[in-house]
Amino acid sequence: MNQFFRVAALAAFALTAQACATRPPVPSAASTTPFVAERDLVGASVARGEFRAITGVRRAFTAQLNGTWDGVTLTLVEDFAYDDGERDRKTWHLRRTGPGRFTGTREDVVGEAQGYQDGDVFRLEYDVMLPTENGRGRKVRFRDVLALRADGDILNNATVGWYGFRVGSVSLVIERE
């Protein structure tokens, strides 16, 4: 009987962890026009958003974005200004590997990001090493979904997971300048 309870507990844990780590849903305000990364992220735009941790911590930011497309690689420079005064620059290099499929790198991404078209939205999944006070860092998984709104702005919602558990989320709107 003890073996039964161990197996049942392990199964319950696995199902709970899977539920916590699910990818973000398609934003409800999304249009029916497909988001196409190499079209919709090219040029200058501004993003306004917020990171929310399950602990209640919130961190708002604005980012100036500049994207270029050379026929194979989308380069997206992101200049962040956080509400606490911190500034940061990150640069995505997303290389098209097939129709609607990309692999990508960024300074803080561990390994390669995977991007893919999923109906009218674009999904991007990647691991990031976040700095910690002890200097060792903490690896978390981001799962982004990008969708166009009817007005042409881009909605980007992301879940942040750690060992399969959802620990935060990011929501932002990207507007053309």
Model features per residue range: what roles?
Residues T16-A19:
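C-terminal motif of bacterial Sec signal peptides marking the signal peptidase cleavage site
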Residues L41-G49, N156:
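A short, Trp-centered hydrophobic/proline-enriched beta-strand micro-motif
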Residues A21-R23:
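Bacterial signal peptide processing site
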Residues S28-A44:
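N-terminal helix-cap/turn-to-beta initiation motif at the start of protein domains
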Residues S31, R48-E133, V145:
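Central antiparallel beta-sheet cores of small beta-barrel/beta-sandwich binding domains
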Residues R143-E177:
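Glycine-rich, aromatic-bearing surface loops/beta-hairpins
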